[in-house]
Amino acid sequence: MNFLKGTLVIDHGKSAFLLTGARSSFPISLENPPDLNSEICLGIRPESVSFEPTGAVNPSSVVFEAGLEIVENLGHESLFHLDLFGQSVKARISSSKPMVASGPGVVRFAFRDMHWFDAKTEKRLSA
């Protein structure tokens, strides 16, 4: 699982996640959120991460610019090692999907695939 560090903030009057190194946040909904400005982690499985040369807006997912560092060809799939604002992200991509394996692109993950954790206690936060 990828664990991305960030901070719980308020944006336009709603709880939001500000990924460390990013300039903009995105809204999140937690049942019992920690205190404002608490460090939290976004957990996302490699198979739930996509990497594309460009990113269209989709209200059910979050898109960030990312750099491609390494591609491991594993036969039926490839493991993309990405740099997202200085944090390492892995994306498991099917080899049947045509991909450009170089240069910058966008990393995308759907809200439904996100898992939240308290950075200090490492306990899961209910969404």
PLM regions: where:
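ABC transporter nucleotide-binding domain
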Residues: M1-H12
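Short acidic, flexible loop segments centered on an aromatic residue
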Residues: L84-F85
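A conserved acidic, glycine/proline-rich C-terminal tail/linker
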Residues: A91-S94
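Glycine/charge-rich catalytic "coupling/switch" loops of P-loop NTPases
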Residues: D11-I70, S88, P98-A127
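Short glycine-rich loop/turn motifs that provide flexible caps or phosphate-binding loops at active sites
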Residues: K5, L42, L74
